């Protein structure tokens, strides 16, 4: 295999290893935050409030559409789109109830309509508070800033939804009318609900947290949440069609627990996506976990390099830096160069007349301690890899344990003695 192919394969293995390490560290961190934020309890609270607010919220949305004459004909299409695409399995029954409830709200007096608007604002405020708790934002929005955000969501949200439906309808019925374009139209229409879900969740994760959120993190959370949402829709539709536990128990009232259960699932998905977005940003800010303290960090790699040079000298082979880098291709090249520089400066190795490297002739009298005390103070901060094939035979676990015992014995001093300076001679 060509050297270039080896480099490509090594790069792929390294990236796969890095991805695996990321997921191994990310998943426990994510689960820990899910438990800490109690998203299932928050989802239940939001589901209950949504069940009480959904009719006022839809009434406000449709009322705003009625204000604009151009969008008034789209009202039934918006109703159908919301119910059939976001409440699976019970769309016909729920739409019939919603139409009656919403029709009743249109006959309410002005104070009743104002109450509906306040109820819708309270729901959005609760969502805002819940998401900001996930992001650990303890400073609430200013009243004017929060009201502006909620007002924008209630007014521009329906307009944007209706505009997208109107634009798509114009394109569907003027461009995609026959032949292959008609088939393409059908496929694109099937993707429209998922696309709107991704965009809605993306805006939710970007705008609602009172903290800067990276676009890529918000998009990742929105995509994962949309995938979970589609899986939940299919499972819920299957459950309603084949199991029908709620209908068997509650009869004609089954629509209420079914709707509540579906809203609960939806909020679990939304909050799960929010946790993913938060954890991606938190992991990036905190960086990788700090390695455990190891006074011999990097020493095994240094001994492996020194052994390689020593063995090559015994076989009459001259080594240079390129050969060392090729042998230790899994390691950080800058760390390897620093190791070689230290060994040369401390005379554990020397350069030959031909420019190669050779081990010192008195290695049999030099000790590990002689090597250790020559290490620079920042040597342990270098980026050293994990033990690989080139490290075989370099085993320092016994030395590490004895060194740890010496540290423990030497530092077995109560901290209070260091605070007040008493018994200083015992330190």
UniProtKB/Swiss-Prot annotation:
* Bilayer-crossing regions: 51-71, 105-125, 147-167, 188-208, 221-241, 251-271
Stored InterPro entries: UPF0761_bac (IPR023679), Virul_fac_BrkB (IPR017039)
> Can the keyword Transmembrane be found in this entry's annotation?
yes
- Please report the record's description of how this protein sits within the membrane: Multi-pass membrane protein
Q: List UniProt keywords, sorted A-Z.
A: Cell inner membrane, Cell membrane, Membrane, Transmembrane, Transmembrane helix
Q: Which family does it belong to?
A: Belongs to the UPF0761 family.
Q: What is this protein called?
A: UPF0761 membrane protein Plut_1323
């Amino acid at each position: 295999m060509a050297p270039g192919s080896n480099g490509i394969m090594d790069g792929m293995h390294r990236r796969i290893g890095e991805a695996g390490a990321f997921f191994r560290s990310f998943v426990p961190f994510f689960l820990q935050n899910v438990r800490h934020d109690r998203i299932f309890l928050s989802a239940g609270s939001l589901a209950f409030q949504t069940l009480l607010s959904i009719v006022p919220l839809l009434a406000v949305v449709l009322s705003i559409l009625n204000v604009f004459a151009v969008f008034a004909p789209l009202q039934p299409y918006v109703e159908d789109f919301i119910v059939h695409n976001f409440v699976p399995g019970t769309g016909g029954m729920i739409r019939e109830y919603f139409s009656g409830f919403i029709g009743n709200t249109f006959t309410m007096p002005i104070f009743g309509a104002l109450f509906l608007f306040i109820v819708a604002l309270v729901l959005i405020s609760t969502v805002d508070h819940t998401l900001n708790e996930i992001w650990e934002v303890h400073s609430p929005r200013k009243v004017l800033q929060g009201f502006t955000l909620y007002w924008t969501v209630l007014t521009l949200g329906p307009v944007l939804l209706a505009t997208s439906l109107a634009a798509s309808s114009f394109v569907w019925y003027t461009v995609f009318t026959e032949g292959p374009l008609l088939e393409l139209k059908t496929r694109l229409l099937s993707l429209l609900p998922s696309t709107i879900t991704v965009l809605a969740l993306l805006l939710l994760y970007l705008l609602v947290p009172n903290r800067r959120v990276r676009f890529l993190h918000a998009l990742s959370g929105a995509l994962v949440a949309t995938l979970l949402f589609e899986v939940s829709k299919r499972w819920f539709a299957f459950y309603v069609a084949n199991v029908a536990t709620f209908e068997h128990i509650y009869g004609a009232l089954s629509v209420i627990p079914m709707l509540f259960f579906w809203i609960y699932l939806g909020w679990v998905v939304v909050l799960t996506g929010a946790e993913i977005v938060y954890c991606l940003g938190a992991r990036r800010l905190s960086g990788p976990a700090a390695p455990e303290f190891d006074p011999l960090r990097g020493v095994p790699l240094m001994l492996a390099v020194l052994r390689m040079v020593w063995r090559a000298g015994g076989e009459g082979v001259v080594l240079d830096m390129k050969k060392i880098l090729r042998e230790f291709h899994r390691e950080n090249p800058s760390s390897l160069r620093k190791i070689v520089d230290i060994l040369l400066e401390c005379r554990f190795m020397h350069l030959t007349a031909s420019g190669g490297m050779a081990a010192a002739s008195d290695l049999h009298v030099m000790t590990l301690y002689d090597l250790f005390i020559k290490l620079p103070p920042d040597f342990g901060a270098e980026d050293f890899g994990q033990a690989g094939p080139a490290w075989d035979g370099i085993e320092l676990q016994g030395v590490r344990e004895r060194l740890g015992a010496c540290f423990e014995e030497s530092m077995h001093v109560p901290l209070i003695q260091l605070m007040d300076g008493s018994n200083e001679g015992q330190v």
